[in-house]
Curated annotation (Swiss-Prot):
Catalyzes the phosphorylation of the position 2 hydroxy group of 4-diphosphocytidyl-2C-methyl-D-erythritol. Pathway: Isoprenoid biosynthesis; isopentenyl diphosphate biosynthesis via DXP pathway; isopentenyl diphosphate from 1-deoxy-D-xylulose 5-phosphate: step 3/6. The active site is at 23, 151. GO terms for molecular function: 4-(cytidine 5'-diphospho)-2-C-methyl-D-erythritol kinase activity; ATP binding. ATP binds at residues 109-119. This is 4-diphosphocytidyl-2-C-methyl-D-erythritol kinase. GO terms for biological process: isopentenyl diphosphate biosynthetic process, methylerythritol 4-phosphate pathway; terpenoid biosynthetic process. It catalyses: 4-CDP-2-C-methyl-D-erythritol + ATP = 4-CDP-2-C-methyl-D-erythritol 2-phosphate + ADP + H(+). Keywords: ATP-binding, Isoprene biosynthesis, Kinase, Nucleotide-binding, Transferase. It holds the Pfam family GHMP_kinases_N. Belongs to the GHMP kinase family. IspE subfamily. The gene is ispE.
């Protein structure tokens, strides 16, 4: 099928797909509230090897939802979804008059502190950019990404980077020591929008993120949103405590504004043992075993 200015989409069995890699904030320091209502932050973004899956299919333009967490989005206006806004913007950059249909396989919890809509939108930018011959690091794509959300530029890159200002000023860093580290994500099945967590933050600037090696900086750092999120949902503290107590855990912390928490491990055996232990103790919690990209 030909779409827009002559782009031919693959047949149904060959629909291109892209992973919307789960985002992890290894550390997140909130420095101050800005005049525009956002907050200046310092963070280390990292990404799991797994996430939601987006696919582009022949039109008409529409958003099709699938996956275990699709029901959480079912009541939303598709045109308000970041995925469709990303598709609109990328097609405009490419000079395409028509959008393809987008299928979103929602495998990660919603409002969970691991990228969610930002990662999905970023995956669409990469996917359609590849189809239309526009590189993901094209300045126009990164500018578009920043208009969609503060985390979207980092999610477009989906590599370990430092983030400053709103989180959209990115600095490339050497992260060889993080690549491939076994990772366990746990969510107590609590949806936690960002706004209430920032509103509960005590507005105390506890200092900058340390420079240098990202793992060392993360270990010396903190997530300033973990305390207010835990005030809102004390179960988050239980998740972090259980993760930190697992043998072989290197770092356990809440990601983003929650409620998903993570632990990094020195070996896949330790990670898998922790996964089994948490499954036995709290079978109702959502879990994902992965590795850092």
């Amino acid at each position: 099928m030909t779409v827009g200015s002559g782009h031919r989409w693959p047949e149904p069995s060959m629909h291109p797909t892209e992973i919307a890699y789960a985002k992890i904030n290894l550390a997140l320091h909130v420095r101050r509230r800005r005049a525009d209502g956002y907050h200046d932050i310092e963070t280390i973004f990292a990404f799991a090897e797994h996430g939601d899956i987006v696919a582009a299919e022949p039109g008409p333009a529409r958003l099709m939802l699938a996956g275990p967490f699709a029901p959480a989005l079912a009541g939303e206006d598709p045109e308000d979804n970041l995925v469709m806004r990303a598709a609109d913007g990328l097609c405009a950059l490419a000079g395409e008059a028509a959008r393809p249909a987008i299928r979103l396989d929602k495998r990660l919890p919603v409002a969970a502190g691991i990228g969610g809509g930002s990662a999905d939108a970023a995956a669409v930018l990469r996917l359609l950019g590849r189809a239309y011959g526009i590189a993901a690091d094209d300045p126009r794509v990164m500018t578009l990404a920043a208009t969609l959300g503060a985390d979207v530029p980092a999610c477009v890159r989906s590599a370990t980077v430092r983030g400053g200002e709103r989180g959209d000023r990115l600095e490339s860093i050497a992260a060889d020591g993080l690549h491939g580290l076994p990772l366990l994500l746990v969510n107590p099945r609590v949806a936690l929008p960002t706004g209430p967590v920032f509103a509960a933050w005590d507005r105390v600037d506890r200092g900058p993120l340390a420079p240098g090696d990202p793992l060392a900086a993360a270990l010396a750092g903190r997530n300033d949103l973990e305390a207010p999120a835990t005030l809102l949902h004390p179960v988050i503290g239980e998740v972090v405590t259980l993760l930190a107590a697992q043998p072989g855990a290197i770092l356990a912390r809440m990601s983003g504004s929650g409620a998903t928490c993570f632990a990094l491990f020195g070996s896949e055996a330790d990670r898998d043992a922790a996964d089994r232990a948490l499954a036995h103790r709290r079978p109702d919690w959502w879990r994902l075993t992965s590795r850092l990209r």
